[in-house]
Amino acid sequence: MAESDSGESTSSVSSFISSSSSSRLSEFVDAKTELQDIYHDLSNYLSNFLTILEETVLLKDRQMLEHLCAFSSRVEAIAKVLSRDRMKVAFFGRTSNGKSAVINALLHEKILPSAMGHTTSCFCQVQANGSNETEHVKVEQEDEHMELSALSQLASAHSPGALKPSTLLQVNMAKNRCSILDYDVVLMDTPGVDVTAQLDDCLDSYCMDADVFILVLNAESTVSRVERQFFKDVASKLSRPNLFILNNRWDKASSLEPEMEQKVKDQHMERCVNLLVDELGVYSTAQEAWERIYHVSALEALHIRNGQITNPSGQTQQRYQEFLRFENDFSNCLAVSALKTKFGPHLLSAQKILNQLKSTLICPFIEKVSRLIDENKERRANLNAEIEDWLILMQEDREALQYCFEELTEMTQRVGRCVLNDQIKTLIPSSVLSFSQPFHPEFPAQIGQYQRSLCAHLDKLLEDRVLQCLSIPLQRKILDIEKEIGLPIAENSCDWQLIYGLDCQSYMSDFQPDLRFRFSLGFTALWHRLEGNLPLHASPFRIQKLQNGHKKCSPLPPLVNGNHWQMLESLVKSKGSLGTVLLSAMAIRSFNWPIVLILGGLVGSFYIYEYAAWTTAAQERSFKSQYARLLQQRLRSDVQQTVSGFELQLRQHLATVRNCWEAQSNETLNDLNVRTAELTKQIQSMEVLQLSLKKFRDKGQLLASRLGDFQETYLTKS
């Protein structure tokens, strides 16, 4: 009954201690999961921020992008390391001290080769395998996976196929096979510090990253010089490492001389405390060192756990409780140490990255965007003011143009009327008189050719006069206006001129000159001279002129005396001759014959003189006089119509100038509106960007707060 009670007591104590140690180890798993989540969010945070910077032209800064990419790469690297971070326990000691047996006891199952003598031939790293992997053993840096049963051949020094001492053999087991592996704990078994002196590099590579170092001693002997030297080397490389000393095989040592058990135990404690405090300096007080020294039997603990010992004795229970105390203490120490050593640097790195990101990127970018928003708002306000000024200027220029156009129109009417009247009054008579070409009145066809040549001559002179006196000045004034309002000088403006097609031939198409001889003292001539108008025979049907052009037709033949007899016949038959006869009869009755004869002689002399003077030149002068008077008369009647044509041409060209100016002004206005719209769009996009950056800053602060909570939860209280 006593043995049963002791068994139940041992079971309850074991359960309590196991629960306590498991809770501490689970903190590591929880902390690792939480820190992985934080780093995952931090990676997404940096990735999203990098995307914003790459898509935003205003914030593109090569150096900043490189810094951000470096942060992102660093976070990814730490996240990969963090996923591999596990709590690591390294077991050291001479061969045959029971290192493998201690590990098997922790695993609750004999996994590693364990026997008397030199057993473990290489470094064995026992760890949980991946979720999709089967249990296997694997030599480091090799891809071949071997069954777990191959462990006895590869890791046992008694096997001919044993690996070299410098080789690392990874033993991957299922998490549910052993509770300690479920908490990301890695157990490192070593070949023995006394196997060879050339294992320093391997120890540095495989064991120096351990969170807890356990020195397994043989309780049947004392600490050897090799073991002392090894831990001195460890203490020199690490700052106050967590060292535990297991005096294994205490069941054997205590059974040799039971009466000396306590003295031997005290001797072991004294020497171990001296090693930990005085020689290694890893603990400050003897009490701290005392709590890290244990007297156990790993083989007994394994047998109890696998059911080989069902009714342990009292001493066996004491040794097993000591092993449980060791397991609990090292688990707590392992969790605390691993939290600090594994997660402390990662925590500081994340905090440093967030602080640097905030100080070098986010805050400067928020300030830069705010400054750009203010600058663009100021530019937009200036553009709006410029648009208002431009609208006012356009209205002023429009009114000024209208005033200039009215002045030009009035000038065109005034100058055009003056030029045309001056042409009619002075230029036509002088130009007709100065025209020189052979004149043959006896040939009607030649007179028609003469008239056409005279018309062409006048057309050229009159058109040139209008061009010089009206068209060119108008062109210059229009060019000055275009320069004043800032219009580019177009080719059509330089080539523009008034169109003035005179075509005198059309005006004079029904002109029929009277080149017959008329005595100046004849009654008909005197009568018409009194009336002030010499008759010019013309066709009763005048061809109507077209606007800006006239119909062409052959000139009418002139009225001339065919020969002397015809001229005499016309004199006899004419009204003037009859009047002369009547007047002579009255003179004979009123005066005496001598007076009548004298007067008749004088009149006859004048007649003979005029007839003799009626030469070709005189007929040409008469032709020109009749032509000039009729052309003046007809042009004078068309002055207003011609001036109206000038005004219409000017208005059409001024309308073109106005349209060009309106188009250019509207183009400038549209450009200002487009620039304003672009600035508004930029401001809106930058405001969205500013809001995004502020959200990123808040997310960064949230991540920093999570890191602070993590530190408070898992690191500070430890």
Curated annotation (Swiss-Prot):
Cytoplasmic side: 1-575, 615-718
Primary localization: mitochondrion
This protein's UniProt keywords: Coiled coil, Developmental protein, Differentiation, GTP-binding, Hydrolase, Membrane, Mitochondrion, Mitochondrion outer membrane, Nucleotide-binding, Spermatogenesis, Transmembrane, Transmembrane helix
Sequence ranges on the Mitochondrial intermembrane membrane side: 589-591
Mutant lacking the gene: phenotype: Defective mitochondrial fusion in spermatids results in onion-staged nebenkerns with irregular borders that contain many small mitochondria. At the leaf-blade stage nebenkerns contain many small mitochondria instead of the two mitochondria derivatives seen in wild-type spermatids.
Region annotation G1 motif: where it falls in the sequence: 93-100
Ranges in coiled-coil conformation: 366-402, 664-687
Annotated binding of GTP, by residue: 96-101, 248-251, 297
Region of interest (G4 motif), residue spans: 248-251
Entries under Gene3D superfamilies matching the protein: 1.20.5.110, P-loop containing nucleotide triphosphate hydrolases
Annotated transmembrane regions: 576-588, 592-614
Tissue and organ expression note: Specifically expressed in male germ cells, in spermatocytes and early spermatids. Not expressed in other tissues.
Residue ranges annotated for the Dynamin-type G domain, each copy included: 83-364
PANTHER family noted in UniProt: TRANSMEMBRANE GTPASE FZO1, TRANSMEMBRANE GTPASE MARF-RELATED
Protein purpose: Essential transmembrane GTPase, which mediates mitochondrial fusion during spermatogenesis. In early spermatocytes, fusion of mitochondria give rise to two organelles named Nebenkern and constitutes an important step in mitochondria morphology, which is balanced between fusion and fission. Essential for fertility.
Name of the protein: Transmembrane GTPase fzo
Taxonomic source organism: Drosophila melanogaster
